[in-house]
């Protein structure tokens, strides 16, 4: 899914400045938004072509997290939150979920675990076992999102077959204390830099709609850009009941699209993925994420909420004249062009139906 954020750009493609980004982030309506989307789409096509990568995940360990991230229903500090709670699942179950994701078109598969970091040797050993099996038994590119991991543990995971490490900055430094107080922004940077130092491909982004200003969205993008990450996952807040952010008003679809487009113009070489919250925040305009510059998205379920059936996501990609990008593992890909439907997919509890929205054009 991720190659390098330092790739050579085609002639005529240059990242925009922070000052220009702070101006364009307010282009959220009419001809200004149309022009912004067209510009982002042109950059996406010039740098990344018309391939889209899909990412699948497993919630390998859920709930009872000691952190207080205000958006997350897995925090043990929020009594009203209702995320599932269970210990680390077995390596076999992780591999089986990866096989399902691969058949659904996933290029990358991420093992996600709640908590500050993996704190038990048994948990780390389970992930190592799963990574070895993923490399041996599937074609997907293995990723992990395991919190504030340190260099020795990350090295073990890399030796077991880890290709990508995911750790979100979540938001701008100036807004971070409004989101989380139990760890610092700099602690997050330490983990990301440790993974980069080991040669792992980096995936780091955040969530929009957590009360930040448009200017702070640009600040956040500048910080991600300066880390030189390969992939930027962009989520839109889907407020979870019982969390401090459950009553936040959603940002508009136009704001979502404008932010994506600005991020593409700021980071033309990065792979930009639209992940959680796209159904709730964009509704009938989900397909416009590619016009706004994204070249990847999620397939299947999220951590604690249901996603669309895989065939709907694959169909959305294909209707835009785009094709799925296969893994770079050199192995035969299990995706045969036909993603599972709702009837075939083990979905989680139903989410509220996305609101219908008029198309932009």
Curated annotation (Swiss-Prot):
Task: Write down the chemical reaction(s) this protein catalyses.
Answer: (4R,5S)-dethiobiotin + (sulfur carrier)-SH + 2 reduced [2Fe-2S]-[ferredoxin] + 2 S-adenosyl-L-methionine = (sulfur carrier)-H + biotin + 2 5'-deoxyadenosine + 2 L-methionine + 2 oxidized [2Fe-2S]-[ferredoxin]
Q: Which residues bind [4Fe-4S] cluster?
A: 65, 69, 72
Q: Signal sequence span per UniProt?
A: none
Sum up the protein's function in the record's words.
Catalyzes the conversion of dethiobiotin (DTB) to biotin by the insertion of a sulfur atom into dethiobiotin via a radical-based mechanism.
Cofactor requirement: [4Fe-4S] cluster; [2Fe-2S] cluster
What is the protein's species of origin?
Anaeromyxobacter dehalogenans (strain 2CP-C)
- Write the record's keywords in alphabetical order, separated by commas: 2Fe-2S, 4Fe-4S, Biotin biosynthesis, Iron, Iron-sulfur, Metal-binding, S-adenosyl-L-methionine, Transferase
Q: Which Gene Ontology BP annotations are present?
A: biotin biosynthetic process
The name under which this protein is listed is Biotin synthase
Report the Pfam families cross-referenced here: BATS (PF06968), Radical_SAM (PF04055)
Q: Give the Gene Ontology MF terms in alphabetical order.
A: 2 iron, 2 sulfur cluster binding; 4 iron, 4 sulfur cluster binding; biotin synthase activity; iron ion binding
The reply on keyword Transferase is yes
How this chain assembles, per its entry, is: Homodimer.
Gene3D superfamilies per the UniProt record, alphabetical: Aldolase class I
Binding-site positions, [2Fe-2S] cluster: 110, 143, 203
**Cofactor: how and how many bound:** Binds 1 [4Fe-4S] cluster. The cluster is coordinated with 3 cysteines and an exchangeable S-adenosyl-L-methionine.
Look up the EC number in the record and give it.
2.8.1.6
Q: Which domain of life is it from?
A: Bacteria
Q: Which InterPro entries match?
A: Aldolase_TIM, BATS_dom, Biotin_synth/BioAB, Biotin_synthase, Elp3/MiaA/NifB-like_rSAM, rSAM
The pathway noted for it is:
Cofactor biosynthesis; biotin biosynthesis; biotin from 7,8-diaminononanoate: step 2/2
The cross-references to PANTHER family, in alphabetical order and at most eight, read:
BIOTIN SYNTHASE, BIOTIN SYNTHASE, MITOCHONDRIAL
Radical SAM core domain mapped to chain residues:
47-278
The record's comment on protein family reads: Belongs to the radical SAM superfamily. Biotin synthase family.
Question: In its keyword annotation, does this UniProt entry include S-adenosyl-L-methionine?
Answer: yes
């Amino acid at each position: 899914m991720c190659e390098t954020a330092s790739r050579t750009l085609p002639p005529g493609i240059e990242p925009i400045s922070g000052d220009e980004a702070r101006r364009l982030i307010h282009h959220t309506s009419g001809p200004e938004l149309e022009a912004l989307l067209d510009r982002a789409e042109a950059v996406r096509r010039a740098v990344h072509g018309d391939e889209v990568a899909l990412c699948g995940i497993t919630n390998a360990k859920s709930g009872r997290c000691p952190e207080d991230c205000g958006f997350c229903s897995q925090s043990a500090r929020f009594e009203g939150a209702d995320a599932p709670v269970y210990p680390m699942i077995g390596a076999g179950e992780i591999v089986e979920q990866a096989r399902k994701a691969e058949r659904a078109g996933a290029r990358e598969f991420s093992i996600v675990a709640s908590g500050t970091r993996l704190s038990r040797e048994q948990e780390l050993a389970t992930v190592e076992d799963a990574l070895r099996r993923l490399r041996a038994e599937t074609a997907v590119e293995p990723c992990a999102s395991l919190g504030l991991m340190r260099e020795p543990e990350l090295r073990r995971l890399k030796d077991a077959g880890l290709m990508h490490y995911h750790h979100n900055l979540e938001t701008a430094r100036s807004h971070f204390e409004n989101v989380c107080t139990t760890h610092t922004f700099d602690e997050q940077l330490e983990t990301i830099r440790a993974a980069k130092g080991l040669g792992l491909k980096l995936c780091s982004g955040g969530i929009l709609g957590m009360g930040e200003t448009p200017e702070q969205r640009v600040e956040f993008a500048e910080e991600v850009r300066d880390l030189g990450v390969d992939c930027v996952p962009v989520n839109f807040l889907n407020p979870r009941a019982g969390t401090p952010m459950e009553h936040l008003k959603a940002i508009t679809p136009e704001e979502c699209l404008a932010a994506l487009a600005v991020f593409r113009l700021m980071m033309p070489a990065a792979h930009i993925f639209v992940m959680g919250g796209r159904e709730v925040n964009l509704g009938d305009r989900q397909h416009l994420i590619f016009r706004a510059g994204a070249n990847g998205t999620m397939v299947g379920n999220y951590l604690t909420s249901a996603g669309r059936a895989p065939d709907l996501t694959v169909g959305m990609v294909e209707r835009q004249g785009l094709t799925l990008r296969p893994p770079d593992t050199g192995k035969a890909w299990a995706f045969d062009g036909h993603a599972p439907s709702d009837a075939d997919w083990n979905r989680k509890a139903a989410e509220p139906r996305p609101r219908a929205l008029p198309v932009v054009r």
